[in-house]
Amino acid sequence: MIFKVKDEDEAIRLANDSPFGLGGSVFTQDIERGKRVAAQISTGMVYINHPTAVKADLPFGGIRRSGYGRELIGLGLKEFVNHKLVGVTDIDGAF
């Protein structure tokens, strides 16, 4: 879908006004601006000047109703294990 908006803020609001958040794209000649916009879009993946894509060497996943977590590469493996913090203090140490 393509929407015409009045400014960058409206574009970000429109992009984030969805129960889904798998991926999106930002098209711009100013790469740094594209990175700033991408950081504000609530999706699991954002591509700058490229349509969304899936590759085995990139993490894949979304947020909200598009799912939680990541698949593929090392990040994906971590989604299927439980991490546990084990703190160790000397028996005579301060709490």
Residues covered by each model-derived region:
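Conserved C-terminal structural/oligomerization subdomain of aldehyde/semialdehyde dehydrogenase
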Residues: 1-95
